[in-house]
Amino acid sequence: MATTTAGRVRTVTGTAVLAALVLVIAFGNPAYTDWAKNHTANDAWGFFLKQLAWPTWSFSSDESVRTILANDIKAVLLIVLTGVFVSLMVDSAASRSGRLFFSSWGAYLFAGALAGLLAAFIQANASLRAAFDWAAGGAIYGLFVGWVLAVVVFASRR
């Protein structure tokens, strides 16, 4: 599904990938993740702000190299898998409908869960239980943050 505006073609998948990239860069960076960890309250809004930092990425840290690599790959996989799942789940006839909103939200939820599951096996002391925890964290991230992506995708359609 593509919309042509002034010589440009916007697709749902492209919009979703761009929104996911912005979310990961803006809220997964070390400055935001440290701020969210240290300065948010233990309430619903603080929970949401901490969830925004789930796809954390870093180039240097006190953690092991494998954990840093796993976190970075998790962030990249989230963006790539968002494109894959949106292209698979969004119907071409779902322009400006509830189906577009909920299918793009669900695609982000699945992308987060699968990115967490796959990246968990790279970290130091990887285990199946830890992979399930990372997948659950990705699903929670997709549930609470995916609506932001869904709103952007929905608003991009005319």
Regions found by a protein language model. Name each.
Residues A2-I25, S95-G106:
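Alpha-helical transmembrane segments and their helix-start/interface "positive-inside/aromatic belt" motifs
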